[in-house]
A protein has these predicted regions:
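N-terminal secretory signal peptides that target proteins for export/translocation
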Residues: 1-16
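Extracellular glycan-interacting surfaces
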Residues: 15, 20, 24-27, 32-669
Length: 669
């Protein structure tokens, strides 16, 4: 049960254990490291895993993500800045941040790898996060819980997949205090008695344990708990150590005798009992917050009664209460980012300015207003979809009404200004000045399908497949979908198509005049008569993951894939592997910048932009953005890229680049 508690839904790079061994010191650190690199524009929000404040200045707040990146705020969470990156890749989940209450320059960050589940690190900073190092004794451990003793801040306790570990010297040395052959493993939560650092509670993926003597002896504390309960969070009352709260997949439990027996708390619906975090108000111990997968719950009478104080759609990962002012509550959430309350959790507003953690799949600059841009995102359900900025990315608003939580893979704009979106379930159009997207999924020629009556006309079926790419030409709209290639000659009012040469699962389509190229993950099909007839381009059988196709103005076809970038100068009859300055594999996108007659490419292995002025025969290494890139565009003379975790990023205004105007038109997944 517990092993699957956190599903991090972004594509990430695999970081081998061998590579991790090369990074015993922090690989990225504070704000100076980001100077001169590209700027993240948004959209604001996304997943937040953890929050922590400086004990001597609670307006100084730190934020942990699911990709190893830390953010900080110096104004109480009103604005955020990218602060540091921990680990060598993008797979470290920072679920716990701890700051020494006696010496706030000492910080700790617990990490576990979403890729391997079994590895991770414990990071330590002595200078308020300016520099970080891994603690060697904990290197490689998947650390799921971390606590500092309130009575002795030199004492830390960490919970990992392989047991419980304790340090009595601020992390310099560590001892495993759980027996290697015991059931005390797969630790999910840790709590230390605020008055006695030898009393430690450990929640596992199967009930909880307690030691009264610093780990020399442990005993099961499960009386009153439902068997097979994953214990996600444990807190000990700051004023009365006999009172202990524990949250599990079966509900919330309270003990009034230091964990010897528990009583299940009533009043919360079963669906909301997956409580990821419990947090006690530091100024009022009768107030306890429960962050669940169905909203935030609050008790003001020490657990006798509970009320939900947010919408049930809010998934809460962490709760922070200002020690100076109990009215000020902040939440780390999935998809919504940081939510802040100034009235004791009666109401919340987003507080994400400067913080973005979104997987952007599409960037579109408005044809008539260069300051207006649109982006499509995935994985954020009702809080995602499409976002629009009308001030060149300084501010964003969600514009997803009618999409009903769909992922958006591609965005295009018709000649009349209408927007077209390809989603994980069909296509949608947003008319000019409209506030709601409308479906455009009528298919008129699916042989053998049952007739369905609509208000406008009779159609054979409704397209519900994934739409990975859309191409709009002066005469035809084309859609690459998981159910085939579809075309429309009436601006999307109806579509016809399906399988092409027996292939259906298309991921990309591009057209130049009558030349059309459409790709599955392993094949490229080419038409020289606008889709009337097709030919298979006979790619190597080694090609397994095509990410997108592109066509230059002189008719050369190119594609980006896991196996590298390939070019055909003869309409798909033959292919050559483009290298000569370009990485030989893991190309995430290749774009043709029509206005500047050049190719731009990105790779999943680097944040560098690659450029070719000779149709791919040779490549020059461009700027290192500091971000993992997926797709590249040129907007108002500056390069802009989508990322899997950091929204969209833009080239610095003073950075040397040859582009002057235009847009690179390739979109890949």
């Amino acid at each position: 049960m517990g092993a699957n508690r956190d599903m991090i839904s972004a594509s990430k790079h695999f970081v081998s254990s061998k590579a991790l061994l090369l990074v015993l010191l922090a690989l990225c650190c504070a704000s100076a490291a980001w100077a001169g690199q590209w700027t993240a524009l948004g959209p604001d929000g996304g997943d937040v895993r953890s929050l922590a404040y400086d004990p001597q200045n609670p307006d100084h707040i730190f934020l942990g993500t699911s990709t190893g990146t830390l953010f900080s705020s110096t104004d109480g969470g009103k604005s955020w800045a990218r602060f540091a990156h921990l680990g060598s890749g993008d797979d470290y989940v920072i679920d716990h941040l701890a700051i020494d209450p006696q010496s706030p320059n000492k910080m700790y960050a617990a990490a576990w790898s979403v890729e391997t589940q079994q590895s991770g690190d414990l990071f330590h900073s002595e200078d308020a996060g300016q520099t970080w190092e891994t603690l060697p004794a904990m290197h490689g451990k998947s650390i799921r819980a971390l606590a500092i003793s309130a009575s002795d801040s030199k004492t830390l306790v960490a919970g990992a997949v392989d047991g419980v570990f304790r340090s009595s010297d601020s992390g310099k040395s560590w001892q495993k205090i759980s027996a290697s052959n015991s059931d005390i493993h797969s630790i999910e939560s840790i709590a230390v008695d605020p008055k006695n650092s030898n009393v430690i509670y450990a929640g596992t993926w199967h009930l909880a344990w307690k030691t009264d003597d610093g780990g020399a002896n442990w005993h099961h504390i499960s009386k009153g708990m439902i068997e097979d309960s994953d214990v996600f969070s444990i807190i000990v009352d700051s004023t009365n150590s006999s009172v202990v709260f524990a949250s599990a997949c079966s509900g919330i439990y309270k003990s009034q005798n230091a964990g010897e027996t528990f009583q299940k708390i009533q009043g919360m619906p079963f669906s909301a009992r997956r409580t990821r975090v419990l947090k006690q108000d530091p100024a009022n111990p009768a107030i306890v917050y429960a962050g669940t997968t169905e909203g935030l719950w609050k008790t003001i009478d020490a657990g006798k009664t509970w009320n939900r104080v947010t919408d049930p759609e809010v998934v809460v990962n962490d709760v922070m209460v200002d020690p100076r002012n109990s009215m000020r509550v902040m939440l780390a959430t999935d998809r919504a980012g940081v939510l802040a309350s100034t009235d004791g959790a009666h109401s919340f507003l987003t507080s994400n300015h400067g913080y973005t953690h979104r997987y952007v799949t599409a960037i579109l600059a408005d044809k008539s207003d260069p300051n207006t841009m649109y982006v499509g995102v995935v994985n954020d359900r009702e809080l995602g979809g499409v976002f629009v900025s009308r001030d060149a990315g300084q501010h964003w608003i969600q514009n997803s009404k009618g999409l009903d939580g769909r992922d958006v893979f591609t965005l295009k704009q018709a000649s009349n200004g209408e927007l077209v979106a390809g989603t994980n379930r069909g296509m949608f159009i947003l008319a000019q000045h409209a506030t709601e997207w409308s479906p455009i999924n009528d298919i008129v020629n699916r042989t053998g399908s049952r007739y369905v009556k609509t208000g406008q006309h009779e159609v054979h079926s409704i397209l519900t497949a994934r739409v990975s790419d859309i191409e709009i030409t002066p005469t035809t709209w084309m859609a690459a979908t998981s159910a085939g290639l579809f075309t429309s000659s009436n601006q999307g009012k109806s579509w016809n198509g399906g399988a092409v040469m027996g292939k259906e699962d298309f991921v990309s389509v591009r057209a130049q005049g009558k030349l059309v190229a459409v790709a599955t993950r392993s094949d490229v099909l080419v038409s020289k008569d606008n889709g009337v007839t097709w030919q298979d381009s006979s790619l190597s059988t080694s090609i397994s993951s095509i990410r997108g196709v592109s066509i230059t103005s002189d008719g050369q076809i190119m594609f980006a894939s896991r196996e590298g970038a390939f070019r055909s100068p003869n309409g798909g009859a033959g292919w050559e592997h483009m290298q000569n300055g370009l990485p030989d594999k893991n190309i995430s996108s290749i774009s043709y910048d029509q206005n500047n007659q050049r190719l731009l490419a990105t790779s999943t292995e680097t944040g560098v932009v690659f450029e070719s002025q000779d149709n791919g025969q040779s490549w020059t290494r461009g700027p290192d953005t500091g971000y993992p890139l997926r797709n590249i565009s040129v907007v108002q003379g500056r390069m802009m890229a989508s990322t899997p975790f950091d929204g969209i990023v833009m080239q610095p205004e003073n950075e040397d680049h040859s582009a002057s105007t235009g847009t690179a038109t390739r979109r890949t997944n």
